């Protein structure tokens, strides 16, 4: 797990994280999005470029973002650590209170890249 405080540099942090955690076949599944702006991030599936554009609007209060391998979909509710492990995501980013980001992954290389990107 990597913890990040994205205060006034939130856009730079988001852009770096998406780049660090995305591979050539990554699709991002967003759920539980709560944002200040209607044109920003919403629940759904995004390519890395689409996600960067949605995040650039800013105002993300809360969201869960799952980096999924292409061809794999998030199924069922993800509420526990066991659910995260079973869902097959490459990484999970949780944003709370507009600025606190937690990055979870079983891949140590992804966590290292996330820490360096922030």
Per-region residue spans from a language model:
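Hydrophobic, Leu/Ile/Phe/Ala-enriched alpha-helical segments that form helix-helix packing faces
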Residues: 17-22, 55, 118
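Short, surface-exposed beta-strand/loop "edge" segments at domain boundaries and coil↔beta transitions
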Residues: 9-15, 38, 73-74, 102, ...
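Intrinsic-disorder-associated interaction segments
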Residues: 6-10, 44, 58, 107
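Short, extreme N-terminal segment that most often corresponds to the first beta-strand
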Residues: 1-21
């Amino acid at each position: 797990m990597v913890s990040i405080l994205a205060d006034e540099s939130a856009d730079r942090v988001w852009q770096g994280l998406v780049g660090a955690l995305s591979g050539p076949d990554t699709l991002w599944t967003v759920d539980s999005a709560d944002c200040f702006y209607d044109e920003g991030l919403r629940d759904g599936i995004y390519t890395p470029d689409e996600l960067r554009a949605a995040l650039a609007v800013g105002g993300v209060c809360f969201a869960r973002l799952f980096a999924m391998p292409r061809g794999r979909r998030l199924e069922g509710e993800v509420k526990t650590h066991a659910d995260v492990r079973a869902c097959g995501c490459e990484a999970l980013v949780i944003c709370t209170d507009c600025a606190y980001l937690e990055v979870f992954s079983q891949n140590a290389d992804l966590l290292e890249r996330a820490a360096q990107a922030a």
